[in-house]
């Protein structure tokens, strides 16, 4: 590692598994002071051994909780928004509750964290905000991902909007649109869909693999 994040403070959501977990460890390995959060703090039990400085329970659906933790930890240089929820369904099978939950976790949570941490970045005259979107978004349509794709498209939109508003004040805002990543979340969704569709877990996993241009699932470390 190069130590390129030495002296930087990074705040991450959904650091208990998958991309968030791998990124927390990667940031720490590069020298950052990492503040990792997750709805389930027990999933972050191994992070401090990997150099992560702080771990906190956080429900990103709560504005009060986000604001309180932001005030507690103080200004950061890097905000990594990774919390997400994958709903499976079409417009005809997606309830209002499914739609609202998808947008609350996938898009509005980023609105909350950016609003909480951006003032500190502006005071310093620099900062980096990284939002995890998805290939299932404005990038491309994926069958059976109606609410998920729409909410992740919103992530692309809010990323561009914040970038346009604050680039001249030293704030960089980017989104990453991964393909399907091997993770505990994917394992759980594969088992759920196998049961619903009357297929094996292996058949469902192959459906995910077949959609990937490189012919395999990605890894969180990648």
Identify the residue ranges that each predicted region occupies.
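Alpha-helical segment proximal to the catalytic Tyr-Lys
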Residues: 119, 164-165
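Conserved NAD(P)H cofactor-binding loop of Rossmann-fold oxidoreductase domains
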Residues: 83-87
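Conserved glycine-rich cofactor-binding loop
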Residues: 9, 16-18
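Active-site helix of classical SDR
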Residues: 114, 151, 159
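Residue(s) in the substrate-gating loop at a strand-loop-helix junction
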Residues: 134
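Active-site loop-to-helix junction immediately N-terminal to the catalytic Tyr of the SDR YXXXK motif
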Residues: 94, 141-149, 161, 189
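Substrate-binding pocket helix/loop in short-chain dehydrogenase/reductase
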Residues: 90-91, 98-103, 208
């Amino acid at each position: 590692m190069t130590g390129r994040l030495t002296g930087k403070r990074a705040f991450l959501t959904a650091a208990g598994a998958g991309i968030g977990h791998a990124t927390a460890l990667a940031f720490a390995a590069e020298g950052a002071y990492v503040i990792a959060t997750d709805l389930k703090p027990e999933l972050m039990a191994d992070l401090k051994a990997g150099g992560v400085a702080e771990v906190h329970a956080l429900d990103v659906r709560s504005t009060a909780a986000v604001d309180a933790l932001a005030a507690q930890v103080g200004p950061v240089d890097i905000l990594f928004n990774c919390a997400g929820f994958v709903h499976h369904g079409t417009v005809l099978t997606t309830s209002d509750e499914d739609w609202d939950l998808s947008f609350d976790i996938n898009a509005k949570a980023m609105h909350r964290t950016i609003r909480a941490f951006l003032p500190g970045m502006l005071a310093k005259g620099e900062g980096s905000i990284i939002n995890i979107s998805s290939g299932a978004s404005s990038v491309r349509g994926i069958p059976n991902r109606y609410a998920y794709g729409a909410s992740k498209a919103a992530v692309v939109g809010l990323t561009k909007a914040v970038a346009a508003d604050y680039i001249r004040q030293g704030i960089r805002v980017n989104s990453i649109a991964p393909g399907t990543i091997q993770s505990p979340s994917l394992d759980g969704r594969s088992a759920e869909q196998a049961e619903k569709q009357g297929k094996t877990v292996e058949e469902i996993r192959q459906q995910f693999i077949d959609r990937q241009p490189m012919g395999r699932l990605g890894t969180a470390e990648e």
